[in-house]
């Protein structure tokens, strides 16, 4: 077994946000959560080092993950990546296992498989990337697959600048290596910080073997700005789309479809152009038509859209929800709502037809109220159902009706005033003085 230490103490100033960098989302999930999931898939001893807004991050993590061991970096004494794994007197964070994997919290694209080459090393090891354009990165000089030295770009000579091998920021150490060399680490540099790369240099000086393990560039993309966050999200979207299509989901123009990590599919599903699936959604044997938005909802044996919006807690089964229909906290069973309706805080029974422009008036300015509609109900266009209201089964509601009282089963309900036609009324109205 191994222990994992995740470094999440940085301010993330380049994000230009009051939200801690590691809580910025990638496909609906805080980026830190992705790496915590990977950590727990390979270890039962996971440590998280915090500083900036640590209570906010700790609260978010604790709601989702159990067993994370939190540490506060002592930045006043030990700043930098090397300082992050230091306790008082420069001793390393105590871990349960002899092998220690060190990861950065801003790498949400890391997978268990991507880490495998590093974890198979029997020596201390550092993860490397081979970059076509390594400009801006320190170079890693190799000799017989071992790290010889790490040179910062500003200190590299012309020959060293041609090297494409750079530090991925991922390390796999023996605990005794940390115990031996961490106390020797110093902050005698321009930034007055302790660096993990200097730890590598100390090990090389002490004749330690440091394996160089090349890793997949895409999986170790660091997120330090909103531009990099967007790039990481696009890569994650490609993974989620591929996973869905591998399950048999049909996607029309996949690049236009947005879905989040919590979305699940069952049966035969079709997603048309511009669909957005947000939060924990279940799409089962359903067709989501163009430019529809589904949030925290279940769509089962139904068609939705185009241009429909299922807001949170909508459960749409065996139904058709058409153009510009919005639902929220709505349970539809065998219902047809073809166009231009708002159905909120309601339950609608089988074989019910909702005409165009029908609104469930669920909010009275203070509280939300529920509308219950039975089976075999026909609701005429442009009707308003003022909640709380209970409509029985086998009910016919005339077009343009405002319902304010319960309707018993078998009833016809109308509330329109009689139509009056005034002869020559047009000419009288527009008569010039």
Curated annotation (Swiss-Prot):
GO terms under biological process: cell morphogenesis; cell wall organization; lipid A biosynthetic process; peptidoglycan biosynthetic process; regulation of cell shape; UDP-N-acetylglucosamine biosynthetic process
Enzyme class: transferase
Entry annotated with the keyword Repeat: yes
Location of the active site: 339
Cofactor: Mg(2+)
Region called Pyrophosphorylase, residue ranges: 1-226
Acetylation is among the record's keywords: no
Subcellular location: Cytoplasm
Positions annotated to bind UDP-N-acetyl-alpha-D-glucosamine: 7-10, 21, 80-81, 138, 152, 167, 224, 311, 328, 342, 353
Span list, region N-acetyltransferase: 248-433
Catalytic activity: alpha-D-glucosamine 1-phosphate + acetyl-CoA = N-acetyl-alpha-D-glucosamine 1-phosphate + CoA + H(+); N-acetyl-alpha-D-glucosamine 1-phosphate + UTP + H(+) = UDP-N-acetyl-alpha-D-glucosamine + diphosphate
Positions of Mg(2+) binding: 106, 224
Keywords noted in UniProt: Acyltransferase, Cell shape, Cell wall biogenesis/degradation, Cytoplasm, Magnesium, Metal-binding, Multifunctional enzyme, Nucleotidyltransferase, Peptidoglycan synthesis, Repeat, Transferase
E.C. designation(s): 2.7.7.23, 2.3.1.157
Family per record: In the N-terminal section; belongs to the N-acetylglucosamine-1-phosphate uridyltransferase family.
Summary of the function given for this chain in its UniProt record: Catalyzes the last two sequential reactions in the de novo biosynthetic pathway for UDP-N-acetylglucosamine (UDP-GlcNAc). The C-terminal domain catalyzes the transfer of acetyl group from acetyl coenzyme A to glucosamine-1-phosphate (GlcN-1-P) to produce N-acetylglucosamine-1-phosphate (GlcNAc-1-P), which is converted into UDP-GlcNAc by the transfer of uridine 5-monophosphate (from uridine 5-triphosphate), a reaction catalyzed by the N-terminal domain.
Subunit record text: Homotrimer.
Name of the molecule in the record: Bifunctional protein GlmU
Species this chain originates from: Helicobacter pylori (strain J99 / ATCC 700824)
